[in-house]
Structures are given as C-alpha cells and as structure tokens.
UniProtKB/Swiss-Prot annotation:
Residues 1-57 form a transit peptide. One of its GO terms (cellular component) is mitochondrial matrix. Phosphoprotein with mostly four phosphate groups. While the DNA-binding activity is unaffected by the phosphorylation state, only the phosphorylated form of the protein is active for termination activity. Functioning seems to be regulated by phosphorylation. It is found in: Mitochondrion. Monomer. The lineage of its organism: Eukaryota, Metazoa, Chordata, Craniata, Vertebrata. The gene is MTERF1. GO terms for biological process: DNA geometric change; DNA-templated transcription termination; regulation of DNA-templated transcription; termination of mitochondrial transcription. Contains nine structural repeats of about 35 residues, where each repeat contains three helices. The repeats form a left-handed superhelical assembly with a solenoid structure that wraps itself around DNA. It comes from Pongo abelii. This is Transcription termination factor 1, mitochondrial.
Amino acid sequence: MQSLSLGQTSISKGLNYLTIMAPGNLWHMRNNFLFGSRCWMTRFSAENIFKSVSFRLFGVKCHNTDSEPLKNEDLLKNLLTMGVDIDMARKRQPGVFHRMITNEQDLKMFLLSKGASKEVIASIISRYPRAITRTPENLSKRWDLWRKIVTSDLEIVNILERSPESFFRSNNNLNLENNIKFLYSVGLTRKCLCRLLTNAPRTFSNSLDLNKQMVEFLQAAGLSLGHNDPADFVRKIILKTLYLIQSTKRVKANIEFLRSTFNLNSEELLVLICGPGAEILDLSNDYARRSYANIKEKLFSLGCTEEEVQKFVLSYPDVIFLAEKKFNDKIDCLMEENISISQIIENPRVLDSSISTLKSRIKELVNAGCNLSTLNITLLSWSKKRYEAKLKKLSRFA
C-alpha cells in the first residue's frame, strides 16, 4: 500500500469506499463506514482531522456495482419509517438526498404539533422533499407570519396538504414579512391576503420591489381609466385574478387588446376588467388574440355578425380561455343536436360543460320529450343537482 500525502491518498482499487472532500485533504475509507470500527485512516489525531474538515454539507459517494448508490442511509430509513414515497421524492428533488444534514424528524414533530396527521406529513415530504431542509427556527417564524393572515393552524395545514411548495419554497422570512406589511398597507384585507396565500402563494415569494411595481402600475391604470379610488381598484383586480402580480407588460398588452378589439371607452373597459373580464389580464396576450381570432372565424362561418361575436365574448369572457379545438368541438356538438347558433349566443355558459355532459344531457332531454329548438338551453350548464331536479319535473309533463 502506498503512503498517504496531505493532498491525496492512494489505495489499492476496490469497489466499496467513501470519498470525503475537505480543504486540502482527501481521504479514502473502506466499507461505507465513517469513523467506524472497521475503517482505517492515516495517523492523524481527531483534532487535526476536524480542523481540516469544514462543517458544511458534503457529498458521500457509495460505489456499488450491484445497486444504485444510496446517498444518506439514515435519511432513507427515517423517510421510509415516516411513510414517504421515496421514488416520488427522488424524482421531484433528487438533490435533497445528497445532503448529510436534514431535519425530517424536526419537521415531523413541528407539523404534528400543528395538527397535521402522519399521512399528511408523508404526502408533503413526498411531493416537496426540500421541506426537510428547513430548520425548526425557520419553520416556527414562517408559521407565525402565516398566522398573521390565516386564522388557524388547521387552515395552514390544509394549504400545505394541497400545495406544500407554497410554504416551503422559500426560507426568506424577512421578504415574506415585508410583503405582508406592504400588501396590508395598500388596503388589501386579511381575507384578500388569505386568498392570495391559498391560491397564489408565489406572490409572497416575489421580491418586495416587484410587488410594489405591480401595485403602483395597477393604481395608475385605475386612475387612467377614471377610477377614483386606486386602492379599491387594486383590491378588485387582485380578488378577481389572483395570479396577476407577475408582469406589468402582460397586463398593459391585454388592457390594450380589450380596448381596441371591442372598441370600449374607459368606463366600459373599467367595468369589464373589474368584473367578468379581469382574468383575461393575466392571460398570455398572444393566446388571447389567437383564441379570439378562432372564435370570430368559427362564428362568422355560422353566419354571425361582428356585433354578435363581440356581444357573445363580452357576455362570457371566459370563452377566451377555451382551447381552439375544444371551442370548435363544443359548438359542433350543440349544432349537431339541432341547437341553433343564436341559442348558443344568447346562452354562452353552455360551453362551461364538457362535451360528454352536453351529449348525455341532450339525450336525456330528448327522451323526456323536450324540443331543444325552443328550450332554454342554460340548464345544460347547471349543477348536477339542479339539472336532475329540472329533468325530473320535465319528465312528469312528457
């Protein structure tokens, strides 16, 4: 066996060894043991060893020709005991398994103390394994900040169960605290912030400057359209479209698209974007334009006028979100069942229903003796309970 040097140690080739990197030193140890009874080292004192090894995360390579290397056996054992789906976690964030310092047990105890079940905790870690890298202090501080918005621990647990990323994505608690203070300062209510936290948590991970930029832009946009209360305008827009705080360029482009396409004056545009058309502001401008062009082309082919097309879209702005093929297929489905385009124009929400729902309901109504050409087709988009109650009444008179 060759002698050891401070820069590098050379040993006879073998399959099983650990490689530990440290400043100015490289040791090779056999048999996957670190400082264990069967490992060997050069004759350095423990004091010298630990002086040369910095206490940061380091990688451990376990070479084995028979199986995939395991990065941290204690971590794997802990996660398996907790019921974590290891395969899912590895696929989502493999880097976590390279860490030698993790806090899965602390995370488990913390979430249990907040009312989370073991199953929920396992699900959270399976889907967002980076959660186990957060320290107890960081978790506690972040939880306290969330409680300034969310009224109970159980509500937070429910949010984490649906979207673990919302809580664990960032560990910058100062940025979170500053964003909460700012959003409260511009007049957003606790209820509004709770909806943002639940549905658009990245708002709170944005830089404070980005959020300020968007809110200031919205206030200016509201004033330019004649709204006399900028704070109220911001509240209305954010409540209608919770993913809005992302791009001022996108919002500007979509405001101009709505204004020019539908020939709206400032008052009409204000009513639209504070109401049913608010979500269009957050849509890709290219997508919005392509979607409208397809709607226009399809309805023109069925004999509709420009005025009818605009009336249709303005009364049901959500139609812009439908993919081109899906919109065309739904129109064709209804037309094939002798429902006229004028009926669809007058009752655009029938397009909320899936094609399978439309077909099954149309069949049931025909069997009940209904004349679809004279029927108010809005019931095609009703809730299941309401629709079935109406169908039952219609069947009695058949």
